[in-house]
A protein has these predicted regions:
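Positively charged, low-complexity intrinsically disordered regions
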Residues: 49, 55, 104, 119, ...
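A general secondary-structure signal for short beta-strands and their flanking turns/coil
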Residues: 18, 133, 182-184
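Short beta-strand-to-loop capping motifs
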Residues: 23-27, 140, 189-191
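Catalytic core of Fe(II)/2-oxoglutarate
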Residues: 142-211
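Non-heme Fe(II)/2-oxoglutarate
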Residues: 1-100, 105-106
């Protein structure tokens, strides 16, 4: 990996170093959420890409890391729902950030699913200038005890539905798990930042309303 992360578990990552919260959406998308959960399908490292995509060396590396640790290469990491356009309010959130060439994906992590520690490789979203690539996560339901998100060695927790965060994807190892009995649902957007995107993400305490 080309990561510049320190990988020292005794150096505690400070607030804002590995991830940053940047605003909140307010609205009621509970009805859409029920349908999103129902429509989601489990994925592994190998099946998380689009259908027909060949397995790349990064996926082989992740599977090797899993099996070396005694886990199955077919570990269910999350459920996915790729049909964001089907849900009006959630899609409104996705379109709000004015990203270019971007992917929308809803993650529904159910009880017992674990996304093992890894570093993202998102260079393909803008090969000419990967520094313009951003991954934005919007939590779609409230945090429950037993739901884990870790960036570097700092926990991200106690979020409310609608909270937005970004992280230093080329460098920060991160992982998630759900040991609660409630599906953890988040909207993940990955693409090229525009000036509008930056303006939105720099408004840290901003509240956005979804009708």
């Amino acid at each position: 990996s080309n990561s510049n992360y320190h990988f020292d578990k005794n150096t505690v990552d400070g607030e804002g170093e590995t991830f940053r919260v940047c605003g909140t959406f307010h609205g009621d998308w509970k009805e859409e959420l029920k349908q999103v959960i129902k429509d989601s399908k489990p994925v592994t490292w190998a099946t998380r890409g689009k259908k027909g995509e060949r397995k790349d060396k990064f996926i082989e590396q992740e599977e090797y890391d899993l099996t070396s640790a005694g886990a199955s290469a077919d570990l269910e990491v999350s459920n996915f729902n790729r049909n964001c356009e089907k849900y009006t309010k959630i899609n409104e959130i996705a379109e709000y950030f004015k990203l270019e060439n971007f992917q929308k994906r809803i993650h529904v992590q159910t009880t017992g699913q674990v996304w093992n520690l890894h570093i993202d490789k998102l260079y393909q979203f803008n090969p000419e200038d990967p520094s313009k690539v951003v991954r934005i996560t919007i939590m779609l339901n409230d945090w429950e005890p037993g739901q884990f998100y870790m960036y570097g060695n700092r926990m991200y927790e106690r979020w409310k539905a609608g909270e937005i965060h970004i992280f230093d994807w080329p460098n920060t190892p991160h992982s998630t798990a759900n040991t609660s009995y409630v599906p953890r649902v988040s909207l993940q957007l990955t693409g090229t930042r525009t000036e509008d995107t930056d303006a939105i993400l720099n408004e840290r305490d901003h509240y956005y309303s979804v009708e």
